[in-house]
Regions:
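Conserved nucleotide-state-sensing and coupling region of NTP-binding domains
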Residues: 83-130
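Motif I (Walker A/P-loop) of helicase-class P-loop NTPases
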Residues: 61-68
Length: 136
């Protein structure tokens, strides 16, 4: 992938995160921006593997949830597996992603009517992509 395309994708993900934080009345901390850049780099660069190490309560799960919602918007056919040591932690992450999808302005068309396909551990979205966010 060209450097120009990688930069455009990073910008798109950062914009999505900034919009989410603005909706919550917050600004995006610099370390969240670095985490998002890392996640985009892992997603776009083979071998698509990385290890994210950050201090407790640094917002790793917050950024990963925003990243997952953005991936679903860009590629609605994607399947994302969330693993954790305890099922309550993975269910909480799914709930975080669901909250973003339900409330981010760019995600309105992704919510299925009746939400029949949603549960504590699974989200199925409408196969549409964000109207204002596209891959370069």
């Amino acid at each position: 992938m060209s450097h120009q395309i990688e930069n455009a994708m990073t910008t798109a993900f950062l914009d999505f995160m900034d919009e989410w934080n603005a909706l919550l009345g917050m600004t995006t901390p610099e370390h969240h921006r670095r985490i998002m850049k890392f996640l985009v780099d892992v997603w776009t660069s083979p071998p698509n593997r990385g290890l994210l190490m950050a201090f407790r309560h640094s917002g790793k799960s917050t950024v990963v949830g925003i990243f997952a919602a953005c991936v679903l918007g860009l590629r609605p056919e994607s399947r994302i597996l969330i693993l954790s040591a305890e099922s309550t932690l993975s269910s909480r992450m799914v709930g975080h992603i669901r909250n973003i999808l339900e409330n981010h302005p760019r995600c309105a068309d992704m919510i299925p009517t009746g939400r029949r396909t949603w549960s504590n551990d699974r989200i199925t979205i409408n196969p549409v992509s964000y109207t204002h966010l596209t891959l370069p």
